[in-house]
């Protein structure tokens, strides 16, 4: 026994990670290239086709003058800007290197060996990685019609449950849980179980019955909401995210995060991006127009499309072979979609809403694929 009373790991010929780490399948991002194709339309990572705000780009360029200086470890200017934008308490805001970092830190802080973390069967892959990294046990619950099922989550809760992750809207399905259901989940969970609401795509949702969950953070000691600057704000390369949490949770995160986990350029650029609401409004309008158009046009070709409230669509095919054939056909034209077999959806591809040019090319490409298939089948 060690001084702490725990059993030491068996000796080995080399340093060994704990068993949870060895059970992790490394995250594989969407493709970004197609060999032999001159022009690429990357529609695999849910990046905004409008790019970042011009004001954000100016702020990023200006930040080069301070590259030799450490950033403000508390990200005070950014937390203040976020609080002002959403009417929040800045003391409850914690910033991170993308919301991925915060999702992982929450597991590291609140989950340990022998304890369980819950997520849904087609939920974001990072949840499982975070749970295993913390030494916890991942518990996967079924969805209903590709949508988070509150009753299934509650049925999976045990005395060992410590954390529940839900993506709302969900990636890669694009479905969402109405606020009434999210509230029911928050109210029904034991008070010692942390509910993490991942609202990475929340800015795109225009449904009246949706909420990212800020209200629940204010009224529950066990609810955290995470957001990112990677999607609608167009700052994916800077790795910038934030969460709104109860004071005790924010305090715990601030104890374990890196002292300078948010870079100076990211802070400055994030502040400028928040201030340019006109750019965000344009991004929302563009998405509303083309999300609807893509769904209708692709549906006319006979492919099933899951209704989405985010900036992407889940396309369904006859089987995995057809999904792979469509993926290869479109890739040959420089149209890069996301295979989602790793999410348990081998018969599907995820399509990011792109520029007008890219969107029209995708539909034209699918039409040509259908024609080629008809010829082959005689």
Swiss-Prot record:
Q: What is this protein called?
A: Histidinol-phosphate aminotransferase
Q: Which organism is it from?
A: Beijerinckia indica subsp. indica (strain ATCC 9039 / DSM 1715 / NCIMB 8712)
Q: Tell me, how does this one assemble?
A: Homodimer.
Q: Which cofactor does it need?
A: pyridoxal 5'-phosphate
Q: Which reaction does it catalyse?
A: L-histidinol phosphate + 2-oxoglutarate = 3-(imidazol-4-yl)-2-oxopropyl phosphate + L-glutamate
HAMAP family this protein is in?
A: HisC_aminotrans_2
Give the modified residues of type N6-(pyridoxal phosphate)lysine.
231
What EC number(s) has UniProt assigned to this enzyme?
2.6.1.9
What Gene3D superfamilies has UniProt attached to this entry?
Aspartate Aminotransferase, domain 1, Type I PLP-dependent aspartate aminotransferase-like (Major domain)
